[in-house]
Amino acid sequence: MAEEPALLRIPPEIRMLIYDYLLDNGGTKDISIRNQSRSEYEALRSKTKRSVYNIMERSIAKKSYETTYCAEPEPRRSMDVAIMHINRKIREEASHFLYTKHAFHFGDDLEAVVPFFADKTPRTRDLVREISLYKRSPTNAIEPDSCDWSSVCRSLRNLQSLDKLTLVIEGARPREPWDGPQSLTVSDFRLLYSTRHESLEWARELASIGTIREVVIVADIHNLPNPESNMMLVLAAFSSSIETSLVDFLRDDLGIPARMGQPQYCGVGVFGRSKKC
């Protein structure tokens, strides 16, 4: 019979302090999950045990390549997860600390969400309390994320204990007033939704999850030249309404527990970064 690890022979409260130290992510509760670059994946390909998937390069070439996900190391101090491989009991205890005490930020690497949670056991998935996602502009025809978004929402239905989803929505509008509607009302959103306008199909998917206790909406607004096309006019008006009438529509009409959040996180959008977060 295998000897019990020394770690299990010390009081549980001491073990919790050890987990707290080893799984400290540089003093922050945030863990960023992202796609590995092509070069990173090729260098570590033979060692990976995680699910692999294909993504498109964010370049003009738009080539597809195989990759997997990884945790972005915290510059100040990286977690030491080796302790989780000692035995099953220690892994269960450490997993409880790792997944309940941290928020997982996927940014706009939505491709990583489904494999990340698919690689976890149902018990581990139920430990996750908080995640954040970056939703590219609903009118973004250059880098649409509609297929990934549908898969993400189906995956999130399996997170039975998810307390908080922070959704950063990309938008763009001119710095000065423009000719055309300056914002959208709740009635406007109702019309767009009822006609299945592409700008709100993502909300239909989000409403189908039904298990999230709180959805925090944050706008990431970039500068836009004076809008001249119908698509740009919709984008500008939509962007002005993300944290106001859109939140009201999501909450009151779709039953999503939405509220406005603080702009603490920016993703990487096709309009470029407008501020440092």
Predicted regions mapped to residue ranges:
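Short, surface-exposed structural microsegments at secondary-structure boundaries
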Residues: 1-130, 136-142, 262-277
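Eukaryotic C-terminal
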Residues: 1-4, 25, 123, 130, ...
